[in-house]
């Protein structure tokens, strides 16, 4: 008798697959728009195990505290300006419509008040390309190179997210990768379906290696592994499609 495959167990959401939320310091987002803005300072810089960049705890003059990604060069005790009158200096939280073209920013809001959506990974930044004051839009270039328009009333932090270069350091040991996966609730290591027994996976079993065949989209959960709903796979498929376009 077959068993539920791993992807079904993960979808059920057992405790071993859930992210350890009790280890998190809190959501990284800007304070609500109704909060009086002005000046603040960096209380501490934290290591957030669920993220790939250090996080700064910022306290405003009115006592409101929030978490934001730390910019490169940010230090504890540094004064931070927040709001309309903030200067475009590293670490300050500014309004996008008042930022000069060519400024590097991160944790950019797509809509005013959403807390930040773009350029949040370690070592990344977006660049302000232009302004459309008549439409209340700001044009920015994302780390991927894509150019998008966002709300000019939205907020962003000037600078580059700290933690750049983290992917340049190799893991060297499987144990290091294990601990990283555990901190982020990733499944590690990943076992190939071909290496399993037939009761554990549709690709399992057999005394010699064999590949799975494409599964129809109408197949029930548990059968959908590998390619499903595909008409053609592999390099030959790419060439065939290219010839069809000619």
Swiss-Prot record:
Similarity comment text for this entry: Belongs to the universal ribosomal protein uL2 family.
Entries under InterPro entries matching the protein: NA-bd_OB-fold, Rib_uL2_dom2, Ribosomal_uL2, Ribosomal_uL2_arc_euk, Ribosomal_uL2_C, Ribosomal_uL2_dom3, Ribosomal_uL2_RNA-bd_dom, Translation_prot_SH3-like_sf
Entry protein name: Large ribosomal subunit protein uL2
Annotated spans, Disordered: 197-226
Complex and partners: Part of the 50S ribosomal subunit. Forms a bridge to the 30S subunit in the 70S ribosome.
Recorded name of the encoding gene: rpl2
Gene Ontology cellular component annotations, sorted alphabetically: cytosolic large ribosomal subunit
Alphabetical UniProt keywords: Ribonucleoprotein, Ribosomal protein, RNA-binding, rRNA-binding
SMART domains to which the protein is assigned, alphabetical: Ribosomal_L2, Ribosomal_L2_C
Role noted for this protein: One of the primary rRNA binding proteins. Required for association of the 30S and 50S subunits to form the 70S ribosome, for tRNA binding and peptide bond formation. It has been suggested to have peptidyltransferase activity; this is somewhat controversial. Makes several contacts with the 16S rRNA in the 70S ribosome.
Source organism, top-level taxon: Archaea
């Amino acid at each position: 008798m077959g068993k539920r495959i791993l992807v079904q167990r993960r979808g059920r959401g057992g405790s071993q697959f859930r992210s350890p939320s009790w280890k998190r310091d809190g959501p990284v987002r800007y304070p609500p728009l109704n909060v009086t803005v002005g000046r603040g300072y960096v209380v501490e810089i934290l290591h957030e195990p669920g993220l790939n960049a250090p996080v700064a705890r910022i306290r405003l003059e009115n006592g409101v505290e929030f978490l934001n990604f730390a910019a490169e060069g940010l230090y504890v005790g540094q004064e931070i300006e927040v709001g309309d009158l903030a200067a475009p200096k590293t670490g300050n939280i500014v309004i996008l419509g008042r930022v000069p073209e060519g400024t590097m920013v991160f944790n950019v809001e797509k809509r005013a008040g959403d807390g930040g959506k773009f350029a949040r990974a370690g070592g990344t930044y977006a660049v302000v390309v232009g302004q459309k004051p008549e439409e209340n839009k700001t044009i920015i270039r994302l780390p991927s190179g894509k150019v998008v328009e966002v709300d000019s009333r939205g907020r962003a932090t000037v600078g580059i997210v700290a933690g750049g270069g983290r992917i340049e350091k190799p893991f060297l040991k499987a144990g290091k990768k294990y601990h990283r996966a555990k901190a982020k609730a990733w499944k590690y290591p990943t076992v190939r379906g071909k290496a399993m027994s037939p009761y554990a996976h549709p690709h399992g079993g057999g005394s010699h290696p064999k590949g799975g065949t494409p599964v129809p989209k109408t197949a029930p959960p548990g059968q959908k592994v590998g390619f499903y709903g595909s008409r053609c796979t592999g390099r030959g498929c790419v060439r065939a499609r290219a010839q069809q376009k000619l």
